[in-house]
Amino acid sequence: MKRPVTGKDLMIVNMGPHHPSMHGVLRLIVTLDGEDVVDCEPILGYLHRGMEKIAENRAIIQYLPYVTRWDYLATMFTEAITVNGPEQLGNIQVPKRASYIRVIMLELSRIASHLLWLGPFMADIGAQTPFFYIFREREFVYDLFEAATGMRMMHNFFRIGGIAADLPYGWIDKCLDFCDYFLTEVVEYQKLITRNPIFLERVEGVGIIGGEEAINWGLSGPMLRASGIPWDLRKVDRYESYDEFEWEIQWQKQGDSLARYLVRLSEMTESIKIIQQALEGLPGGPYENLESRSFDRKRNPEWNDFDYRFISKKPSPTFELSKQELYVRVEAPKGELGIFLIGDQSGFPWRWKIRPPGFINLQILPELVKRMKLADIMTILGSIDIIMGEVDR
């Protein structure tokens, strides 16, 4: 980083990587002129674990537990993108029931991610009370995850061709009760937060991004939709069963931190609508496509035995990825999560490139904080919503 040539004495401040508002091990080298930000340089890589290289040395079923460590607050989306790629390469059809359950889990994960963004974001700008209310609702979502998958986080629930297990008895009623309860709580958030004059002073007009600027920077998710671009991959790509439900893209025109807050708050309400429709119209039938377990009998006859595949239900590492390349993407809570996958007729991917939304969205931070106050850095960084496990991979 070059020191700006000015006649004033500037101060260089290190924020992070242990600062509580960095939301992980992010380090910012901030150049200050008094309280005004002159320059900001993000330093990444403290949580780099070589996730792409690990993928190239694992079968897909072996790699699934790893992907939940990317964005560890929205693990259903990392699992979804990991199984969607091989499903498209192998032309594997997912049963309708499994697709509906996937949608339910994805939207619950979106709500949990937005809640865990909202609580610390409010704490960053000085509002402590909403933090505890928001974490109470998040616990209810995690209770639903634990009942269905056995894990509160790192669920390992998605499988190639379906899901790991069907929904347990009574889970649907419990989830519907949560939906009714949560809609009333969103109204409480609006009363407590959205109309609070102190909150509005901190976020209104701070970190403004125009629509064309957002596109040029490659932003996605709430960052893009808050800048006046109604772009949502659930509507554009129509993956899973999203085109069978009625819901609206939530977007704002202002492009500031307040607009990004409003988009995420409205998205939680839309997610509840999708979950309610999916639960009420949940079809019967199988929850996995057993044909996805079919392999080359000549090469590995013991892995195709009835006892191995259907009695013990052991996943075989011989699922071959056909020799072609593919880009798959989903609308994660933070934006467009994608993978570029190249198969070479073997059990391991030849190339596995991750497109993390948090990494792309973080690139605009230095532009947003220049000429702002030091205290606005926390507001702007919090409104971007990053998880360093996904940024560093």
Curated annotation (Swiss-Prot):
Which interval of the chain is the signal sequence? none
Q: Which PROSITE patterns match?
A: COMPLEX1_49K
- Record's Gene Ontology CC terms? chloroplast thylakoid membrane
Task: Tell me which SUPFAM superfamilies the record gives.
Answer: HydB/Nqo4-like
For this chain, the annotated S-S bridges are none
Its GO biological process terms?
A: photosynthesis, light reaction
Q: What is this protein called?
A: NAD(P)H-quinone oxidoreductase subunit H, chloroplastic
Instruction: Spell out the family assignment given in the record's similarity comment.
Output: Belongs to the complex I 49 kDa subunit family.
InterPro entries in UniProt:
NADH_Q_OxRdtase_suD, NADH_UbQ_OxRdtase_49kDa_CS, NDH1_su_D/H, NiFe-Hase_large
Lineage, top-rank taxon, reads Eukaryota
Keywords, alphabetical: Chloroplast, Membrane, NAD, NADP, Plastid, Plastoquinone, Quinone, Thylakoid, Translocase, Transport
Q: Which GO terms describe its molecular function?
A: NAD binding; oxidoreductase activity, acting on NAD(P)H, quinone or similar compound as acceptor; quinone binding
Q: What is its EC number?
A: 7.1.1.-
